[in-house]
């Protein structure tokens, strides 16, 4: 699947589940639970213990059923390890030209982060089609996304950071093309079987929430 094809997956499914787990085993269990609920795009933060193994395990178990990426990568070295683990996309917390170029070279979809209008606009000027607004909850939430969309109307935005489940429709209404949800989805007790069943139900609730049309 090409980077362009992967980008279309984001625009089709529009929800990214960003895993939260204390161990690699819990991360894989949580991944199974959210996939059972209907999630089709998973982000594995590089800070999860054994993140590369988690990526490899999910890719092996679910093959083409789910798109798997690594989150918040700060260096080319970590990007290289993730690519060797068969990652499909990478998100960045900020603009990192070296990592962006490395991912492009290896045909991995890269979604860099920006916060201020200036940062987001500079990424758009360099041809990035999807920019991660992070941490969006600290910059005004859905209202801020709406401001960015009015300022830079032709750019697709992925809202991430500090989003709770009930807030998701607000972000779509404000103009976000994609919403990533992490701590707002994964309970602190994730890793225990009852919590896994609850997690699957929470995902179903999430996917049933209304979404404004992609523009």
Give the label of every model feature segment:
Residues 40-41, 88, 109, 129, ...:
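Residue-level detector of anion-binding/catalytic polar loops
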Residues 127-132, 144, 153-154:
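A contiguous pocket-lining binding segment that forms or flanks enzyme active sites
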Residues 20-21, 70-76, 92-95, 112-117, ...:
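Glycine-rich beta-to-alpha transition loops that act as phosphate-gripper elements at the mouths
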Residues 139, 145-151, 200:
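A charged, well-structured terminal subsegment
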Residues 93-139:
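Histidine/lysine/aspartate-rich catalytic loop segments that bind and position anionic ligands
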Residues 26, 54, 77-78, 98-99, ...:
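Short acidic active-site motifs
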Residues 1-86, 105, 154, 165-166, ...:
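Conserved N-terminal beta1-alpha1 strand-loop-helix module at the mouth
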Residues 89-99, 132-141, 175-196:
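Glycine-rich phosphate-binding active-site loops on the catalytic face of alpha/beta enzymes
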């Amino acid at each position: 699947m090409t980077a362009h094809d992967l980008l279309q997956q984001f625009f089709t499914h529009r929800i990214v589940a960003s895993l939260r787990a204390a161990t690699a085993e819990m991360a894989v269990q949580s991944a199974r639970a959210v996939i059972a609920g209907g999630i089709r795009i998973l982000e594995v933060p590089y800070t999860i213990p054994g993140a590369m193994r988690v990526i490899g395990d999910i890719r092996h178990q679910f093959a083409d059923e789910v798109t798997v990426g690594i989150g918040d990568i700060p260096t080319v070295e970590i990007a290289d390890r993730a690519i060797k683990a068969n990652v499909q996309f990478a998100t960045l917390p900020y603009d990192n030209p070296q990592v962006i170029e490395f991912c492009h070279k290896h045909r991995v979809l890269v979604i860099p982060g920006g916060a201020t209008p200036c940062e987001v606009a500079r990424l758009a000027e360099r041809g990035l089609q999807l920019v991660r607004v992070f941490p969006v909850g600290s910059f005004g939430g859905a209202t801020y996304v709406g401001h960015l969309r009015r300022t830079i109307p032709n750019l697709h935005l992925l809202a991430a950071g500090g989003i709770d489940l009930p807030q998701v429709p607000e972000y779509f209404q404000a103009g976000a093309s994609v919403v990533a949800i992490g701590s707002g989805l994964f309970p602190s007790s994730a890793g225990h079987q009852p919590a896994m069943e609850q997690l699957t139900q929470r995902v179903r609730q999430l996917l049933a929430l209304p979404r404004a049309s992609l523009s």
